[in-house]
Regions:
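A conserved acidic, glycine/proline-rich C-terminal tail/linker
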Residues: 179-245
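General beta-strand structural signal in soluble alpha/beta enzymes
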Residues: 6, 33-36, 67, 89-92, ...
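Anionic-ligand-binding alpha/beta catalytic cores of soluble enzymes and soluble regulatory domains
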Residues: 117-182, 190-191
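Conserved active-site and cofactor/substrate-binding residues in soluble primary-metabolism enzymes
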Residues: 15, 19, 28, 43, ...
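Active-site histidine-anchored catalytic micro-motif
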Residues: 27, 44-48, 60-69, 73-128
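N-terminal glycine-/serine-/threonine-rich phosphate-binding loop
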Residues: 1-76
Length: 256
């Protein structure tokens, strides 16, 4: 059975989600539609990309992922269908694709499929659903549009020198854990076995990496590398972002 996932910033109180599902089922009744999340903050492309990037490979190859965050089409932000790692994505190129693809090779096209209505404010229902079904039915990208090179994201990358790494909070999850843009690979590369101090929130420091949240007593802060591969700052059984006064883009620095 074909699988189509949905990710959006619509929430669950309006008609948008069921309308899109209805459109998909009308075109392909025998399909499994999976909600990744509809609770992304409005227009928060970065968070949507982080969520999808960290779960899409757990789905079977051939799954189609519909990205419905900031979908309005323009000459700068075209509607695009993309294939990477044997998964398909349909959405608007507002840099969400480059955040998901990262350094992986991909194939992309600008969608040249007419939608069935004259309304252009609900492209996910009127166009993306149609393209997602086409991909689920095995239609090649070459029949959906012309080749396209996705836009590069201008997201801040960690800077580093011989004695420090300077990063920031990239994402805050439902537990208020602070996920940074510092990868474990970069940390180990620059650390080179040296002692280190992680500084954050203006006055807090950590001098070790934990394996789990339970490595420290309740209400103490800690640092670990999660399954996503990034440095994470958390408080055992509590909310790090709120209690530490931190937010996305807050600085996190590591000194050696």
């Amino acid at each position: 059975m074909a699988i189509i996932t949905l990710t959006s910033d619509w929430g669950n109180s309006d008609f948008y989600v069921p309308a899109v599902k209805g459109a998909i089922f009308s075109l392909l009744p025998d399909v499994n539609i999976v909600d990744i999340t509809h609770n992304v903050k409005s227009f928060d492309v970065k968070s949507a990309a982080f969520i999808v990037k960290n779960c899409y490979k757990n789905f079977p190859k051939g799954t189609v992922h519909v990205l419905a965050v900031d979908t309005e089409e323009s000459s700068d932000n075209p509607h695009v269908a993309l294939k990477v790692n044997d998964h398909y994505f349909v959405g608007t190129d507002n840099t969400i694709f480059s955040l998901i693809v990262d350094k992986d090779s991909y194939e992309a096209v600008i969608i040249d499929v007419m939608q069935d209505t004259g309304f252009f404010t609900f492209s996910t229902r009127d166009r993306f659903a149609k393209v997602a079904v086409m991909l689920s039915n095995g239609v090649p990208l070459s029949e959906i549009g012309k080749p396209y090179h996705i836009k590069e994201s201008l997201e801040f990358k960690p800077s580093y020198d011989a004695n420090a790494i300077h990063g920031l909070v990239y994402y805050i999850d439902a537990y208020d854990n602070l996920i940074t843009n510092i990868t474990q690979e970069l940390f180990e590369q620059e650390r080179a076995g040296r002692k280190f101090t992680i500084k954050f929130g203006g006055k807090y420091t950590i001098n070790k990496i934990c394996d789990s949240y339970q490595d420290v007593p309740s209400s103490e802060h800690l640092a670990l590398f999660g399954t996503h591969g990034f440095l994470e700052i958390a408080i055992n059984h509590d909310k790090a972002a709120s209690l530490l006064g931190m937010h996305t883009d807050s600085s996190v620095d590591i000194y050696f």
